[in-house]
Amino acid sequence: IGIHDGVDFLHSGTVRRVDAEGVRGILDQDAIALLSPLGYSPAGEIFSVSASEVAEKVAVAIGADKLIFLDRQPGLHAADGELIRQCTIDSAWALDIVDAEQQRLRDSACRSCTNGVARSHLLSYEREGALLEELFTHDGSGTLIAQNPYEQARSANINDIASIVEVIRPLED
């Protein structure tokens, strides 16, 4: 609602609750749930809310595995300007981000991962094929934020032998 700590933000507000059951019902029908950044007070007043906050709150409420943000920027960048392909929540919080919209997206991505969403992605809507590249290639096209490092290599141990044999067995033929 538009009043926080005694300050009236007029027609701007925050998400107070999400109809998770309604959203899941739409998704269960294999339909797309299109959500606007508008909220309604109990009195019927209309408030503008942050689209990234709506996405964050809905993703958490429905138990989403993944949350994808589209922005002009292709993702988060290191101090040297290099695109960060993946990072943990802690390392994302530590980034010094100047752009206000990038801060909002980073904050929503980190909060959603902290509250149960496995992965959040920040991609550019200006790059053709960015979504497909992010989802179906090793390096992706933007920034992946996750609670823990998403991809880690480790040395095989004795417990891995059965799985390794299963993987290479078709190659023996």
Predicted features, each with a name:
Residues 1-172:
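C-terminal catalytic "cap/lid" subdomain
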